[in-house]
Every structure is written in structure tokens, then in C-alpha cells.
């Protein structure tokens, strides 16, 4: 069994990873009361994934500012805690992630207007749209409200916080970071003309909207070793029209030239959560419907524009054959696996790369949780996504109980 999926890949920073099947980031809520990692449940879970045979293990979302959380239990970097204490907790986390030589990177993020139950900040004072009608409006007003437009000083502060978090990850022993610029979080809000109405240096054109991301990449690069990996997660579903696609390609060229090591393609926001639900049958191209992955068509459309930049697609892969086909067709260089990695944490080692498992049985299982009746009645997709996310969080937090089942 000679799989392209099993071949090593060398990133721009010089790191060589043993295969092209990577465990993608998910919401995990492993933070303690000080927003630190390091609980036994957290470390045990990552020891399991580290022994699973993944080419790379990505951690769950880490927020760069504890005042704005993407999820209530997220790990975050609190500058009021002595750095030695924070670094000790992160080193224990990195060690757990790196068992048996595994490589791990930290996903770093700021939720922007998707921070709940606080006066959130965003590039512009544009609120979330959870759907038509009074009930979605009431829910949005209660949970998210209308964000406050950031000052330039606040933008500079966020850039600094991303760089400081990356430096912390490097000092702790992680192999790199992934900048989260997808799923409707702060950086995706800046990149999108729909949520960024600024007319200063950080808005008004595709290039200006990408400036905060470019500044973050440069700030990180100036503060970490050259061999430290810096990847980025990018939305596909924000770029449906010809103008949006043109802007997208301009931004991706700028991001690639700034010095990232890989680009992960995902999609969706709290308004339209395709990262959980996939692309709707009505909107999906026929070619997308016949493939497993949600975002392969977008990946193929940008492939020729980004020569030399490793491309990762996450979302929808469920079989060895589907994963291998994506690589053979040159749709991507890397396959990202999220929820199946919870139900089958040893998926690469025990199933996908196991010669004794035939293709028909080489399946990445995922559990689909029914949308609550109230969510269907209200017509708010985000509620259904939330129910499924909570189900998987509980599974993740109990994953360490199988640590000895090697």
C-alpha cells in the first residue's frame, strides 16, 4: 500500500513531517480557572493523539486575550500571570503533545465580534446576523450585541498579543502556531468587506483589509526561530462572487509572500456554520457533492495561484480513498481530520496506514448530532452547531481515559 497520504512533507520553515494526515484543531475547553492548560485530562488527551500516528497535531483554539473568548473554556494567554508560571504549564502541554517524537502546533485566535456576553470588539460596528425574524435578533442582542469598532492602538495591541502567544508556544517547545483567520473570528472579520467597513490603513481595499494579518505574520516571524512553523487557517465560503474571489486571491498572495508555511482551507462562520454542517446541497457544485471534502473546489480554484505553498483541506473526509484521491488529483497537499480524530484518535496508525485494513473498511467515523427542535423552530443554525460542539467537547475531555489502550 503506497499512499501519497503516507509520504513526508517538508514545510518552508524546514520542518519535515512524517505524513500528510493531520489532526485539525477543535473546540476543547481545557482551560483551568487561570486559563492555563495542564490539567491531567488535557495532558492525557494530547498524549493519546501524540501516539496516534498523525503527521501533525494541532491544538484547540487558544485565545490571545482572556478578555475575549471564543468559547468559555478556552485556554488563553493572561499577561497578569507571571510568565514563568504560564510557561511551566505550556511546557507540560507541549511535552504531552510531543510524545514519541510527534510534532504539535498551537492554533491562536481572537474571536472579535463572536465573543459572547461581553462588549466585543471588531474592525467595524457590524453585528452578527443569526437569521431573519425577532427571535434570532433577540438571541444575537443577548449573547453578542453590537461590537465596538477597534481603534488603531487596539489593533496594534492585538498584533502584539498574537506575537507574544507565538513566542510563548516556541519557548514551551511547540513546533509552531496556526493563525486562525477563518470561521468568522476577528481576522476573518478584517479580511471580509462585509464586516470591515474601515477607511483607514486597515480597511477600504482587499490589501488594506489583510494588513492586520500580514502585520501579525511579520511580528511573529521577527520573534521566533526560523524553523518555527507559522500556518494560517482561511475561509473558503467568504468568497463566492467574482469580486470576492479576486479580493481573496490578492489577500492570499500577500499572506503567502509574508512567510507562512502552510494554508489550511476551511469555511463558515457563526452566521453560516459550514465548518460543521458542510456546504448545502443547494449551493454545492456537483463536483463538490461527489467528493467527500467540503472545500475541495475552492482549494482547486486557488491551487495554481499559490505554487509552493502547502495546502491543507479540512472538513468532510471520511475514507482512505477519499483522502488519497484529493492528493492524487492535486487538490491539496495535506488532509485535515477533526471530529473523526475524537472517535478514532489512533486513526492514522490503526486504520488509514494499516496495511491489514482494506479500503472498504478504512473509514473515519464521525457522529452527527441531531439539531435541537428549538433550533429548527427558530431557524438558527448556530444553535444546532452548538449542540454538536458540546457533545464532542465532552468526548474530547474523556479521551485520556483510553491512554493505556495502545
Swiss-Prot record:
What Pfam families does its record include?
Oxidored_FMN
Return the InterPro entries for the record. Answer: Aldolase_TIM (IPR013785), NADH_flavin_oxidoreductase (IPR051799), OxRdtase_FMN_N (IPR001155)
Binding positions for substrate? 180-183
Q: Which domain of life is it from?
A: Eukaryota
**Pathway assigned in UniProt:** Mycotoxin biosynthesis
Q: Name the coiled-coil region(s).
A: none
Supply the alphabetized keyword list: Flavoprotein, FMN, NADP, Oxidoreductase
Entry function: NADH-dependent flavin oxidoreductase; part of the gene cluster that mediates the biosynthesis of ilicicolin H, a 4-hydroxy-2-pyridonealkaloid that has potent and broad antifungal activities by inhibiting the mitochondrial respiration chain. IccA to iccE are sufficient for ilicicolin H biosynthesis and the roles of the remaining enzymes, iccF, iccG and iccH within the pathway have still to be determined.
The name this protein carries in UniProt is: NADH-dependent flavin oxidoreductase iccG
Amino acid at each position: 500500500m503506497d499512499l501519497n497520504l503516507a509520504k513526508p512533507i517538508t514545510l518552508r520553515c524546514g520542518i519535515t513531517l512524517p505524513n500528510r494526515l493531520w489532526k485539525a484543531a477543535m473546540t476543547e475547553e481545557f482551560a483551568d480557572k487561570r486559563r492555563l492548560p495542564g490539567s491531567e485530562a488535557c495532558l492525557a488527551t494530547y498524549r493519546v493523539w501524540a501516539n496516534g500516528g498523525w503527521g501533525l497535531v494541532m491544538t484547540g483554539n487558544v485565545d490571545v486575550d482572556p478578555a475575549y473568548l471564543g468559547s468559555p473554556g478556552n485556554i488563553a494567554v493572561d499577561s497578569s500571570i507571571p510568565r514563568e508560571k504560564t510557561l511551566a504549564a505550556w511546557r507540560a502541554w507541549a511535552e504531552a503533545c510531543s510524545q514519541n517524537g510527534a510534532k504539535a502546533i498551537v492554533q491562536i485566535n481572537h474571536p472579535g465580534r463572536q465573543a459572547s456576553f461581553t462588549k466585543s470588539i471588531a474592525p467595524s460596528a457590524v453585528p452578527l446576523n443569526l437569521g431573519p425574524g425577532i427571535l434570532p435578533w433577540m438571541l444575537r442582542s443577548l449573547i453578542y450585541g453590537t461590537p465596538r469598532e477597534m481603534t488603531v492602538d487596539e489593533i496594534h495591541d492585538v498584533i502584539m498579543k498574537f506575537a507574544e502567544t507565538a513566542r510563548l508556544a516556541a519557548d514551551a517547545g511547540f513546533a509552531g502556531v496556526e493563525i486562525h483567520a477563518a470561521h468568522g473570528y476577528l481576522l476573518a472579520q478584517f479580511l471580509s468587506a462585509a464586516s470591515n467597513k474601515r477607511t483607514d490603513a486597515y480597511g477600504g481595499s482587499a490589501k488594506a483589509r489583510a494588513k492586520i494579518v500580514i502585520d501579525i505574520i511579520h511580528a511573529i516571524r521577527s520573534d521566533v526561530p526560523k524553523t518555527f512553523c507559522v500556518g494560517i487557517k482561511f475561509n473558503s465560503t467568504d468568497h463566492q462572487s467574482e469580486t470576492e474571489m479576486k479580493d481573496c486571491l490578492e489577500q492570499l498572495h500577500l499572506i503567502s509572500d509574508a512567510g507562512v508555511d502552510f494554508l489550511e482551507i476551511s469555511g463558515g462562520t457563526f452566521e453560516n456554520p459550514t465548518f460543521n454542517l458542510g456546504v448545502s446541497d443547494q449551493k454545492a457544485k456537483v463536483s463538490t457533492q461527489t467528493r467527500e471534502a467540503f472545500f475541495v473546489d475552492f482549494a482547486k480554484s486557488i491551487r495554481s495561484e499559490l505554487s509552493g505553498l502547502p495546502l491543507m483541506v479540512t472538513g468532510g473526509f471520511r475514507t482512505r480513498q477519499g483522502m488519497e484521491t484529493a492528493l492524487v488529483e492535486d487538490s491539496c497537499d495535506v488532509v485535515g481530520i477533526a471530529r473523526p480524530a475524537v472517535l478514532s484518535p489512533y486513526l492514522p496508525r490503526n486504520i488509514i496506514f494499516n496495511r491489514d485494513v482494506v479500503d472498504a473498511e478504512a473509514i473515519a467515523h464521525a457522529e452527527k448530532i441531531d439539531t435541537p427542535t428549538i433550533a429548527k423552530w427558530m431557524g438558527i443554525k448556530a444553535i444546532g452547531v452548538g449542540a454538536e460542539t458540546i457533545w464532542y467537547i465532552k468526548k474530547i475531555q474523556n479521551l485520556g481515559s483510553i491512554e493505556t489502550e495502545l
